[in-house]
């Protein structure tokens, strides 16, 4: 049996946490041969609820669950962790301006970034799920100067998976047969899901669908506003699908994608006209525990416009919290 890996989950007593923890403990994220020790972080007022979740985790008798730590202190939560899923974030309350939301999360992710910097394993893989995910990931990265910026990622896998399912429904093909989908930009309604390069059994998805009006007026708005549609229908934000996307993201990053494209929010290297350092969704392939962006894709006029639109939103978010970094 391998030595256990320490995995931190923040917001562990929350809705996404509840959908996530049992799947991590069962081996779905890091493999069925990899024991884990869960480091569970949540607010002081959530510690009792967190104990209840831990009781349930114990009651599953997962062979791979080698231990658990519950805490409200990020310095304890991130000690020696190899994987950190930053799920907890300040939700937007009624009447709250986006600027205030950015500010509140700025404080949270500055503290967590610093704690990761001081206590996590040097090769820690960080995934930010809590919204606004790209900007929160950027804040955490900036607050951890001793860690490689490449260690920090934002979750665009939910947008990616949402886009896959819409394409499968439109073409009548199985979702697993779709390859080479890309999602660009921010995890927000401005994201740009791009199937120009996608194939199903070697055939072009763009040629199969062959409908630019559907792409612009149905597909992109449906994927972009899917989170809002779920809140409208269920009265709660998407939790199980977000947890599923987080599992997919980390599993692929750690275990590899076998040459398949997936989408991750990563610090830009300056390619595709995206300024260096911006936390931006791009297509990647993963192998040997590292992601490599897919290079050399042609960007047409419509794509450029959509990619610049989502970039502008990211730069606006970043400007709103720039004062946190002097």
From Swiss-Prot:
| Residues that coordinate or bind substrate | 92, 98, 131, 162
NCBIfam families associated with the record: MalateDH-SF1, PRK05442.1
Q: Which Pfam families match?
A: Ldh_1_C, Ldh_1_N
Q: Which organism is it from?
A: Chromobacterium violaceum (strain ATCC 12472 / DSM 30191 / JCM 1249 / CCUG 213 / NBRC 12614 / NCIMB 9131 / NCTC 9757 / MK)
What gene does the UniProt entry assign to this protein?
A: mdh
Q: Which residue stretches, if any, does this entry annotate as coiled coil?
A: none
Reaction(s) catalysed (UniProt annotation): (S)-malate + NAD(+) = oxaloacetate + NADH + H(+)
Listed binding positions for NAD(+) are: 11-17, 105, 112, 129-131
InterPro entries membership: L-lactate/malate_DH, Lactate/malate_DH_C, Lactate/malate_DH_N, Lactate_DH/Glyco_Ohase_4_C, Malate_DH_type2, NAD(P)-bd_dom_sf
The UniProt entry's sequence similarity note says: Belongs to the LDH/MDH superfamily. MDH type 2 family.
Active site annotated at which positions?
187
Q: Look at the named UniProt entry and state the broad enzyme category this protein falls under.
A: oxidoreductase
The reply to whether Transferase figures as a keyword in the UniProt entry is no
Keywords tagged on the record = NAD, Oxidoreductase, Tricarboxylic acid cycle
Output the GO biological process annotations, alphabetical, semicolon-separated. Answer: malate metabolic process; tricarboxylic acid cycle
Q: Could you tell me one molecular function GO term of this UniProt entry?
A: L-malate dehydrogenase (NAD+) activity
Q: What is its EC number?
A: 1.1.1.37
Q: What does this protein do?
A: Catalyzes the reversible oxidation of malate to oxaloacetate.
Say if the entry is tagged with keyword Oxidoreductase: yes
What protein name does the entry list?
Malate dehydrogenase
């Amino acid at each position: 049996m391998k030595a256990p890996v320490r995995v931190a989950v923040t917001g562990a007593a929350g809705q996404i946490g509840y959908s996530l923890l049992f799947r991590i403990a069962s081996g779905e994220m890091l493999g069925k041969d990899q024991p884990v020790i869960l480091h569970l972080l949540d607010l002081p007022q959530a510690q009792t609820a967190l104990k209840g979740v831990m009781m349930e985790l114990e009651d599953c008798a997962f062979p791979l669950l080698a231990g658990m730590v519950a805490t409200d202190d990020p310095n304890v939560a991130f000690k020696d962790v190899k994987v950190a899923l930053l799920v907890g974030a300040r939700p937007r309350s009624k009447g709250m301006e986006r600027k205030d939301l950015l500010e509140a999360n700025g404080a949270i992710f500055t503290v967590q970034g610093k704690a990761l910097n001081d206590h996590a394993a040097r090769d820690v893989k960080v995934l930010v799920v809590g919204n606004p995910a790209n900007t929160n990931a950027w804040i955490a990265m900036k607050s951890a100067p001793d860690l490689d910026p490449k260690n920090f990622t934002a979750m665009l896998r939910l947008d990616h998976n949402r886009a896959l399912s819409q394409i499968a429904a439109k073409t009548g093909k199985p979702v697993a047969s779709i390859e080479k989908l890309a999602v660009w930009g921010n995890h927000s309604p401005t994201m740009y899901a791009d199937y120009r390069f996608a194939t199903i059994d070697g055939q072009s998805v763009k040629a199969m669908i062959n409908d630019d009006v559907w792409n612009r007026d149905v597909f992109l708005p449906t994927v972009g506003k899917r989170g809002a549609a779920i809140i409208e229908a269920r009265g709660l934000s998407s939790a199980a699908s977000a947890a599923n996307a987080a599992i997919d993201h980390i599993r692929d990053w750690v275990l590899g994608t076998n040459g398949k494209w997936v989408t991750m929010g990563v610090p830009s290297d300056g390619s595709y006209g995206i300024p260096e350092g911006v936390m931006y969704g791009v297509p990647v392939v993963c192998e040997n525990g590292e992601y490599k962006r897919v290079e050399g894709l042609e960007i047409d006029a419509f794509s450029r416009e959509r990619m610049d639109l989502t970039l502008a939103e990211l730069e606006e978010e970043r400007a709103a919290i720039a004062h946190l970094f002097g």
